[in-house]
From Swiss-Prot:
Name recorded for this polypeptide: Cell division protein SepF
GO biological process, one term: division septum assembly
Gene3D superfamilies reported in the protein's UniProt record: SepF-like protein
Annotated PANTHER family: CELL DIVISION PROTEIN SEPF
Keyword annotations: Cell cycle, Cell division, Cytoplasm, Septation
Function: Cell division protein that is part of the divisome complex and is recruited early to the Z-ring. Probably stimulates Z-ring formation, perhaps through the cross-linking of FtsZ protofilaments. Its function overlaps with FtsA.
Organism: Tropheryma whipplei (strain Twist)
Main location class: cytoplasm
C-alpha cells in the first residue's frame, strides 16, 4: 500500500522519485534520426497545356513524385495565373517547390528533389 501512495504522491508532485537512473549498456548508443535514402530521379514530365482544364495531367505526375515542367506560353494570361495558383497550392499541399525557370515556364518539384541554380556574378 505504501508503494501505491508513494507513486500517487510522485505523480502529483508532492514527493520526489528516488529511483536511480540507469545508463544505457555500453554496447548501445544514443538514438539519432536516420536520414531517408534519397529516391533516384528517373523521369521529368514536361507539360504544355492549352487550357486550364488540362491541369489534371500535372496532378497525376506530381502525386507520383515526378518533377513537372509546366510551359504556359500557350495559355491566356488569366489561365496562366490560375494555373500558377493551382500549382503553388499543389506544391504546398504535397510539400514540394515551385520555381520560375523563364517567362511562363515553371518547375514543380517534389520534396526529395534538390534544385541548384548558378548565380551570375556581377563583374
Amino acid at each position: 500500500m505504501a508503494g501505491g501512495l508513494k507513486k500517487a504522491m510522485v505523480y502529483l508532485g508532492l514527493a520526489e522519485d528516488n529511483q536511480e537512473l540507469h545508463s544505457a549498456p555500453s554496447g548501445m548508443s544514443h538514438l539519432r534520426r536516420v536520414p531517408h535514402p534519397k529516391q533516384q530521379m528517373s523521369e521529368i514530365f514536361t507539360f504544355h497545356p492549352k487550357k486550364y482544364s488540362e491541369v489534371s495531367g500535372i496532378v497525376e505526375r506530381f502525386r507520383q513524385n515526378i518533377p513537372v515542367i509546366i510551359d504556359m506560353s500557350q495559355l491566356s494570361d488569366t489561365d496562366a495565373r490560375r494555373m500558377i495558383d493551382f500549382a503553388s497550392g499543389l506544391s504546398q499541399g504535397l510539400v514540394g517547390k515551385i520555381e520560375r525557370v523563364v517567362g511562363k515556364v515553371f518547375l514543380l518539384s517534389p520534396e526529395h528533389i534538390s534544385i541548384s541554380t548558378e548565380s551570375k556574378k556581377e563583374e
